[in-house]
Amino acid sequence: VSVNHALKHAASSIGKKITIDWIDSENINGNVDTLSKYNGILVPGGFGTRGSEGIIKTANFAREKNIPYLGICFGFQLAAVSFARNVCNHSDANSTEIESNTNNPIIDLLPEQDGVTDMGGSLRLGANDINVKPDTVANKIYGQNTISKRHRHRYEFNTKYLDEFAGKGMIFSGESDSGRRMEILEIPEHKFFVGVQFPPEFN
């Protein structure tokens, strides 16, 4: 509901009307071409294995067809997995939330979560500062070099793959204040391909 309201308010602010279709990602696997009629794709937060392959295919379709894409939280994570599979040629790339034995854990547990079994009490929660790199789409959107965003997640991008991703055309334009965690991804050569680890909401 909040995503619907945000999109409608954004459209209204620029004098546009918007039509929103909710699509079950479980139904995407063999029908990804049905997305070609859309002017933009937004993948909101989520978790688990259900529909994950459909999301990965959706992110790849948006990238290949130059369709604007915004991935939020899980949509950020699986956009990175999709890029690893289809651009970096790591065919088994995945999130360890989905496949714990993958040889290419693009998304992995936060270091402090390793061995934690109390899922509800182990999330990374609350507001955290994010440094936004200059001359990026993210910086143009926020208009500042530091932002504060709320978080709610246990998994994050594996920085082992940072240089490889950059060499293939995906950069991380926002990172935690410590520089340890990647918060915003984008493809500079794409019309608009952005993912954010945090929910982009008011504090």
What are the functions of these language-model segments?
Residues 1-146, 151-189, 197-203:
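N-terminal beta1-alpha1 cap of cysteine-dependent amidohydrolase-like domains
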